[in-house]
A protein has these predicted regions:
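Intrinsically disordered, low-complexity segments enriched in small residues
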Residues: 1-94, 98-324
Length: 324
């Protein structure tokens, strides 16, 4: 019995519209979305293949820990032939948000996309139901508008990712964006734009089976308290805290949570971010007061809470309420 893995991948041919499901057990020994994708590339995408060729692949992949609740395991890997780098080497773009975990909850470890669509489309996945949907209405729109439209069309339970006009026009360093992150450079946006693939909308209601849930919880708590929570020269508070040996001499970094720094519009009343001792795993998420790092004290007046990517305690995003 396989643990961690969902056990199958999707293959989507945009030229023909064919969508099939494939068992992926033979890729498990390569561990993770990147390893699986590189093996598929090795088998199916010759080095001389141009990134804009119809046979060029774009592979979305997640690993066995994705969706299992292990800290910092929620990212999705996207492997393709770079439109940016010299020689169009095979490259990876990693992205956060919640879409990687949602892909696993939908029952898939990856999506292998080939072909070129005649018209703009997006890939819709809802558990076992997979379809290519018309994206003509959002072709030409930016990523915020496109992601918003896909959510409105499908429901708030869906996680979405979209390219923008840069990708559509084959800008060779364009990206794919979700609500909580982006794919970085190397031209994933252009690779998808060439295929007329505007984006993804995914909803999954499944779960990830692990061999020993108790051990996974122990490992996760160790990572939270001893590794992520550990105080060292690469991870120190912006302001002195009573438990911490060091703090940032500049007084300014993303670890800006500190006594007196508030989320003043938090539901139920203001929340003082306070101190975050290394061994209190319930306070790790209070550390990264990104709004305070960006805008200083005025940010606290409008902060609702910190947000972030799936399974990540670092919480890089600040949610604001700017209504009077």
């Amino acid at each position: 019995e396989s643990y961690g893995w969902a056990g199958k991948i999707l293959r989507v041919n945009l030229t023909t519209g064919e969508i099939i499901t494939q068992d992926d057990e033979k890729y498990h020994k390569y561990i993770g979305g990147m390893g699986m994708a590189y093996r598929i590339m090795y088998e199916e995408a010759p080095m001389e293949l141009d990134p804009y060729d119809e046979k060029a692949l774009v592979i979305f992949g997640v690993g066995p820990l994705t969706g299992a609740g292990v800290p910092c395991s929620g990212r999705m890997n996207v492997t393709f032939r770079s439109t940016w780098s010299k020689g169009h080497s095979i490259i990876d773009a990693h992205m956060g948000g919640h879409i990687g975990s949602m892909l696993k909850y939908a029952g898939y470890d990856g999506i292998v996309v080939s072909g070129i669509s005649e018209k703009p489309v997006y890939l819709r996945i809802e558990d076992g139901e997979v379809s290519l949907e018309d994206a003509t209405e959002i072709w030409g729109k930016g990523t915020f508008a496109a992601n918003k439209w896909m959510v409105e069309q499908n429901g708030r339970e869906f996680e979405t990712a979209s390219i923008g006009p840069a990708g559509e026009n084959l800008v060779d360093y364009s990206t794919l964006n979700t609500s909580f992150g982006n794919s970085g450079g190397a031209g994933l946006g252009a690779a998808m734009g060439n295929k007329k693939l505007k984006g993804l909308a995914i909803r999954g209601t499944g779960s990830v089976k692990v061999a020993d849930p108790k051990k996974v919880l122990e490992l996760s708590n160790y990572m939270m308290g001893n590794l992520i929570g550990g105080n060292n020269n690469h991870n120190v508070p912006a302001q002195p805290q009573s438990w911490a040996e060091y703090s940032a001499t500049s007084g300014k970094n993303r670890w800006s949570g500190a006594p007196g720094r508030m989320w003043k519009k938090a539901p139920g009343g203001p929340v003082d971010t306070g101190e975050q001792p290394y061994n209190d795993i319930n306070k790790v998420a209070l550390r990264c007061f990104k709004g305070y790092f960006d805008f200083g004290a005025p940010a606290a007046e409008y902060t609702v809470k910190n947000g972030g990517c799936s399974s990540c305690p670092i919480r890089c995003y600040t949610e604001y309420d700017v209504d009077p």
